[in-house]
Regions:
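Conserved catalytic SET/PR domain of SAM-dependent protein methyltransferases, capturing the structural core
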Residues: 1-101
Length: 101
């Protein structure tokens, strides 16, 4: 069953910009929080993880690209992974480079 966000994340007002993703518990480095974007042919779809994470020059998360295949076509998806230990209550951030593809 698809869940828009893992149970340990929430969306709330950000000091960075608008709304952001925040932790409800400590997250350890390397934690895969799920899919943030998917690209099928030339169209990019953003999940709530990709839509609410804010930019930072020194982020605590990164995108990990995965090439997927099925019987009809290949597609790419990106998962959001913690690059540092993140404390409860902290905002998740990412370096915005996705649309430089």
């Amino acid at each position: 069953m698809y869940k828009p966000l893992p149970s340990y994340l929430t969306i709330k007002t950000s000091k960075v910009n608008g709304l952001g993703l925040f932790t409800l518990e400590n997250i350890t480095i390397g934690t895969n929080m799920g899919m943030s974007h998917i690209k099928i042919k030339d169209t990019i779809f953003r999940t709530p993880l990709g839509g609410f994470i804010n930019h930072a020059n020194e982020p605590n998360c990164a995108k990990v690209e995965l090439l997927m295949t099925n019987d009809s076509f290949d597609y790419k998806k990106w998962n959001l992974v913690a690059t540092k230990d993140i404390k409860e209550g902290e905002e998740l951030t990412l370096r915005y480079t996705f649309y430089d593809i």
